[in-house]
Design a protein with these regions (language model features):
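Acidic, Ser/Thr/Gly/Pro-rich intrinsically disordered interaction regions
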Residues: 1-34, 52-159
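Extended, well-ordered alpha-helical segments in internal regulatory regions
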Residues: 42-51
């Protein structure tokens, strides 16, 4: 079964999500948040471009709450306004020398949830969607020559 480019984007998003385990703060937190949100939205763009009837396929899912209230809305806010409704806070355990960092959504449908949990939910949503596409045997557009290498695909990003 063909692997979609969108699956590589999901893999990269999982890698970026795992960086939150390093308890990022300040600049590192903001940069990683931008990366995760941009990648989550890029999955949809890749899928639309990979299929001959991409718009028709994507129309089935674009009204799902995780897409409208999180993937699209959060990406738009951070990329178009360079602001977010996610904050981080250090939480220490009383009687212990340990503390942890929580990344909490401060407004909207996901208010009070940890952004890592919602990113995970979005990743799972995309993976389920791709599984459905594979089961329905949608036809990929001939965008990728099987002889292409990763460096060939990366060339446009070097300029």
């Amino acid at each position: 079964m063909d692997k979609f480019r969108a699956e590589q984007v999901i893999s990269d998003c999982k890698l970026a999500l795992s960086r939150f385990d390093d308890e990022l703060i300040a600049d590192e937190f903001r940069l990683n948040l931008v990366l995760c949100l941009a990648l989550l939205r890029a999955v949809g763009h890749c899928l639309q471009n990979e299929f001959r009837n991409g718009d028709i396929i994507f129309n089935k899912k674009k009204n799902d709450k995780i897409f409208t209230d999180f993937i699209k809305k959060f990406r738009d806010k951070i990329l178009k306004n360079y602001s977010s409704n996610v904050g981080w806070e250090m939480v220490s355990v009383v009687g212990s020398n340990t503390c942890s960092i929580h990344y909490i959504i401060t407004e909207g449908s996901y208010k009070g949830k940890d952004i890592r949990d919602v990113i995970t939910e979005a990743i799972n949503w995309w993976e389920q969607y791709i599984l459905e596409l594979k089961q329905e045997k949608y036809t990929l557009q001939p965008l990728i020559d099987t002889e292409e290498t990763i460096s060939d695909l990366a060339q446009p990003f070097l300029y």
